[in-house]
Amino acid sequence: MYLELVKKKSDILDKDGNRIKEVELPIIFSFPVRKDLIRRVFIAEFTHSLQPKGRDPNAGKRTSAESFGINLGMARVPRVKNSGEAALAPNTVGGRLAFPPSVNKKLAEEANVKEKRLAVISALSATADIAFVRARGHVFKDSVRFPIVVTDDIVNLKTTSEVEEFLKKIGVYDDVERVKERIRIRAGKGKMRGRKYKEPIGPLIIVHDSNSPIIKAARNLAGVDVVNAKDVSVIHLAPGAHPGRLTIYTESSIKILDERLSKRVVS
């Protein structure tokens, strides 16, 4: 079965939100969105970032507790001498774990190189579809057309206030406000482990230069990420394996993505 793909068109906006011209997008923005592939590759990339963990083999076993035996009218759990306090067993306070985590456990999932490439293309295609972006929960003005492509000079924005003003002019700052309002304290022990707050995902800005001033300028805006087009992956484009992140491209980043992906997939 062959799919006939039609190239999409998009407006190029300047940093004031004015339409400069219309351009034809690379074919990678017209591919069908493969949710199954995006999920598979997301899990593979995410699990490769996990660190193996284990437990001290003697944890919970540093005690002289032994069972008192039978026919005493009490449970046969190991007990500390002279106190009768239960210890060592998995169902006791301070006892060992029945099945502790092992450093030998295989955490990382695998995916093929071609699957990874096609998953990135699928995720890019979803950013060009307003239905996927809305389904992800992003908020923006009704006048916004997808994908959002802007001129290269936006990478020279040096202050957070300039980036904030730029996002307002292109109609996506409401999404930053949504993230701000929904930052909340995490449930559970993660609060004690350096992960106190949970922050929703906001807009993604894809640039063509890793030394762009906008990278530092935008990092203080809630939920906003700035990534080089050479490094962008499913992790950035489809957080949680949910495609359709609100994404802003610079004109040159589109060309880099085209060179990186089109030649290897489209024959």
UniProtKB/Swiss-Prot annotation:
Record key words, sorted: Ribonucleoprotein, Ribosomal protein, RNA-binding, rRNA-binding
GO cellular component terms given for this protein: cytosolic large ribosomal subunit
Domain of life of the native organism: Archaea
Gene Ontology BP term (one): translation
One GO MF term attached to the UniProt entry: RNA binding
Keyword RNA-binding on entry: yes
UniProt xrefs under Pfam families: Ribosomal_L4
Function, as annotated: One of the primary rRNA binding proteins, this protein initially binds near the 5'-end of the 23S rRNA. It is important during the early stages of 50S assembly. It makes multiple contacts with different domains of the 23S rRNA in the assembled 50S subunit and ribosome. Forms part of the polypeptide exit tunnel.
Assembly mode: Part of the 50S ribosomal subunit.
Family: Belongs to the universal ribosomal protein uL4 family.
Entry-linked HAMAP family: Ribosomal_uL4_A
Protein name: Large ribosomal subunit protein uL4
Name of the encoding gene: rpl4
